[in-house]
A protein has these predicted regions:
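Extracytoplasmic/periplasmic solute-binding protein
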Residues: 130-139, 144, 169-221, 239, ...
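Conserved N-terminal structural module of periplasmic/extracytoplasmic solute-binding proteins
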Residues: 4, 10-96, 100-101, 111-114, ...
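A structural signal for short loop-to-beta-strand junctions that line the ligand-binding cleft
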Residues: 76-77, 84-85, 114-153, 174, ...
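Short, solvent-exposed loop/beta-turn-alpha elements that line the ligand-binding surface or hinge
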Residues: 108-120, 162-163, 205-233, 283-287, ...
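Hinge/lid segment of periplasmic solute-binding proteins
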Residues: 22, 90-148, 168-171, 196-202, ...
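Conserved C-terminal helix/tail region of periplasmic/extracytoplasmic solute-binding proteins
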Residues: 59, 154, 345-346, 354-365, ...
Length: 423
């Protein structure tokens, strides 16, 4: 089948770029973060099925839920020559190892053969690599914020947080929730402390300076500056919450899925997570969906609760291996074209950020989706995650040591210094 197969997109026909004939029955090896527990897994499966039906090709899907182990496996596959044909992955420094190794193809190079590739995306919203080129076609974006279980809050006499929610009020709410016999914060410090760290950093700094990163001197000693001070203070805030007993009793051993279930089942009041959880709760906790509300992470210092974290952090890469395979090149291009078309991305986007030139239209939002849309109206500032601006090794070191910090085995300063030494 020709790579110029027409695909409908938002009520009009968009033609996929064509340079080569797609070999009949091509099998594409694809890796994404749309694992079985991802809220968009069903949308992903539907989109892949649509590609297979339209092209006659088959997708060998090796998707898994995104975490540090998954990232490590992806990078290891590139190192051993086992990389996929198409990869849906982070577009920040996490992608530097395989970009710098020449293992993926730039959009600029692809456009030499397929001029219309990714032209439905805003150039300004596509990630730029250190060489000044673009490599990933962006998918739907994200936001991170506070999810609340309104049933738990009601039982504890606590109000749903608004855009003026403060840290002091939050601490008082946590005290009341704990005294009422509920878990204040659903979080696995063992597996996913990421979200609490991100907002704790912003709470000890500002939106404008959020992307500032600590540094070490030539001797490997952490430099005392505003960036290092706010990172240290962030870890100390998390330690304060731990010592107060506001996390689950097994926060240092439980998996993220277990603590999220505590929130979903009405055992815990608060959860910081991302926009992808809208689909997750709709799929896995449909009977309780009315209990969940998207609210605001408590603000502290210069940060109001209406400043949040968000952006577009992931996209589709075509690997050099697929590009240089005559049997797979056009099939890989067609796959990315299909997955990032307005029609397909429209199924992934409800309240998320999008790079699509024409945007998407949504209707018939569920109660939790509508609460997200309502909360987003009050957003006063948006910053990308600063943790995504440090190396994978530095990030792993930082988050592995958070349990040590909260239990007093390591100081917050030591943890930040150890992480930045690996940056």
């Amino acid at each position: 089948l020709a790579a110029c197969l027409c695909l409908a997109a938002c009520g009009r026909e968009e033609e996929a770029p064509a340079a080569e004939e797609i070999e009949e029955g091509v099998v594409l090896n694809v890796v994404t973060s749309y694992g079985v527990d991802d809220g968009n897994r069903r949308n992903y499966e539907t989109a892949v099925a649509g590609y297979e039906a339209a092209t006659g090709n088959r997708v060998n899907d090796n998707s898994s839920v995104s975490n540090e182990d998954w990232k490590s496996r992806v990078l290891t596959d590139f190192m051993t020559g086992s990389e996929p044909d198409v990869l849906f992955y982070f577009t920040n420094v996490d992608a530097d190892p395989f970009i710098n190794a020449g293992k993926v193809v730039s959009i600029e190079e692809i456009r030499e053969e397929y001029p219309d590739y990714a032209t439905n995306m805003k150039e300004s919203m596509m990630a730029v690599a250190s060489d000044g080129k673009h490599y990933a076609v962006p998918s739907s974006g994200y936001w991170e914020t506070l999810f609340v279980n309104r049933r738990v809050l009601s039982a504890c006499g606590v109000s749903i947080p608004g855009p003026d929610y403060t840290w002091d009020t939050f601490l008082e709410d946590c005290r009341r929730i704990k005294e009422a016999g509920y878990i204040p914060i659903a979080c696995s410090l063992y597996e996913i402390p990421h979200y609490w760290f991100e907002f704790a950093v912003m709470n000890n700094g500002s939106l404008a300076g959020h992307m500032e990163i600590p540094v070490v001197d030539d001797a490997g000693v952490l430099v005392d500056d505003p960036a290092s001070r706010k990172w240290i203070a962030a870890l100390e805030d998390i330690k304060e919450l731990y010592e107060a007993g506001y996390f689950p009793d097994d926060t240092l051993t439980a998996a993220d899925a277990e603590t999220v279930a505590m929130f979903g089942n009405g055992e815990a009041a608060f959860l910081i997570d991302g926009s992808w959880k809208l689909g997750y709760f709709t799929k896995n906790f449909a009977r309780r969906i009315e209990d969940y509300v998207v609210a605001y992470v408590p603000g502290k210092g210069q940060r109001p609760a209406s400043d949040t974290v968000g952006g577009i952090s992931m996209g589709y890469f075509i690997t050099r291996k697929a590009w240089e395979d005559p049997a797979k090149q056009a099939a890989a291009v067609e796959f990315v074209f299909h997955m990032t078309s307005e029609e397909v991305l429209g199924t992934f986007v409800t309240t998320e950020v999008t790079a699509l030139v024409n945007g998407t239209e949504t209707s018939g939002l569920s109660t939790i989706q509508q609460s997200a849309a309502d909360a987003n109206v009050h957003i006063t500032g948006l910053a990308e995650a600063v943790q995504d601006a440090i190396s994978g090794e530095a990030k792993s070191e930082l988050f592995i040591n958070i349990p040590k910090v909260v239990t007093g085995q390591m100081t917050a300063r030591e943890a930040v210094e150890a992480a930045i030494r690996r940056n």
